[in-house]
Swiss-Prot record:
UniProt protein name: NAD(P)H-hydrate epimerase
Annotated ranges, domain YjeF N-terminal: 12-234
GO molecular function: metal ion binding; NAD(P)HX epimerase activity; nucleotide binding
Other comments on record: Present with 1380 molecules/cell in log phase SD medium.
Sequence intervals crossing the membrane: none
Family: Belongs to the NnrE/AIBP family.
E.C. code: 5.1.99.6
Keyword Cytoplasm: yes
UniProt binding sites for (6S)-NADPHX: N69, N70, G71, G72, D73, G142, F143, S144, F145, K146, P147, P148, D173
Primary gene name: NNR1
Listed cofactors: K(+)
Job of this protein: Catalyzes the epimerization of the S- and R-forms of NAD(P)HX, a damaged form of NAD(P)H that is a result of enzymatic or heat-dependent hydration. This is a prerequisite for the S-specific NAD(P)H-hydrate dehydratase to allow the repair of both epimers of NAD(P)HX.
Biological process terms in GO annotation: nicotinamide nucleotide metabolic process
Length: 246
């Protein structure tokens, strides 16, 4: 088994800043597209449709998107999942008004006929049933979460904790509610079946349950020199894969 290499929340934010700074010039949109694409690949790898009955294939991937960029990764992931033959539904209770870009991501989901539920429309709890939902993508908070959690997300996470033993949760970058550096800090807490760390795992990933949580790294967008500059080795992705199982 490979040794986990981790970067703190502070360093993760610095890496992002530099990637999107004037020297390198990635846009947030570019990185988010690759991040969301890799999460969609992880869902496919973990829950393949091949060989499944029509009933199983019709089940939903329920994507819960938070107000920041972690939520944006979820919106992108849902679009790719639709292209991959899945049946995603997005719950987006607190929409980012930060940029036009988030509205565009929602327009794209409309274009792909992926339902996007608001807090006050539709009964989102209906999707927390194993006969209806294949897995839940937790794209609520990533590396910028600062406890304690505010509503409506506190209540949403409590509901997720109730069903996580019967519907697997795929957490994007950081399991929502965990301290990025320290891991689970309150009870109940999300224990994902799958964690997709983006760029490089954060320290909290050492708290995932051994033999119960599958850990992938995704967000394949940095060259070796850049990784080394921040003190870690790049991951050995194979071929055109956007994810690597750790
Ligand atoms: N290089 C990469 O790996 C990339 C990662 N990406 C993803 O971006 C997130 C980090 O995004 P950011 O916008 O900085 O933060 P979050 O989404 O984690 O959350 C900010 C959001 O949440 C609100 N908030 C914070 N704490 C609370 C709280 N206690 N209660 C309620 N609300 C809270 C805050 O106000 C903001 O609105 C990273 O993890 C990756 O998933 C990008 O896609 C780019 C590439
Ligand atoms: K998350």
């Amino acid at each position: 088994m490979s040794t986990l290499k981790v970067v703190s929340s502070k360093l993760a934010a610095e890496i992002d800043k530099e990637l999107m700074g004037p020297q390198i010039g990635f846009t947030l949109q570019q990185l988010m597209e690759l991040a969301g694409f890799s999460v969609a690949q992880a869902v496919c790898r973990q829950f393949p449709l091949r060989g499944k009955t029509e009933t199983e294939k019709g089940k939903h991937v329920f994507v819960i998107a938070g107000p920041g960029n972690n939520g944006g990764d979820g919106l992108v992931c849902a679009r790719h999942l639709k292209l991959f033959g899945y049946n995603p539904v997005v719950f987006y209770p607190k929409r980012s008004e930060r940029t036009e870009f988030y509205k565009q991501l929602v327009h794209q989901l409309n274009f792909f006929k992926v339902p996007v539920l608001s807090q006050d429309e539709g009964n989102w709890l209906e999707y927390l049933k194993p006969e209806k939902t294949l897995c839940i993508v937790d794209a609520i908070f990533g590396f910028s979460f600062k406890p304690p959690m505010r509503e409506p997300f506190k209540g949403i996470v409590e509901e997720l904790c109730k069903v996580q033993n019967i519907i697997p949760i795929v957490s994007v970058d950081v399991p929502t509610g965990w301290d990025v550096d320290k891991g689970p800090i309150s009870q109940p807490s999300i224990n994902p079946a799958v964690l997709v760390s983006l760029t490089v795992p954060k320290p909290c990933s050492s708290h995932i349950r051994e033999n119960q949580t599958t850990h992938y790294v995704g967000g394949r967008f940095i060259p070796r020199d850049f990784a080394n500059k921040f003190g870690f080795e790049p991951f050995g992705y194979e071929s055109t894969d956007q994810i690597l199982k750790l």
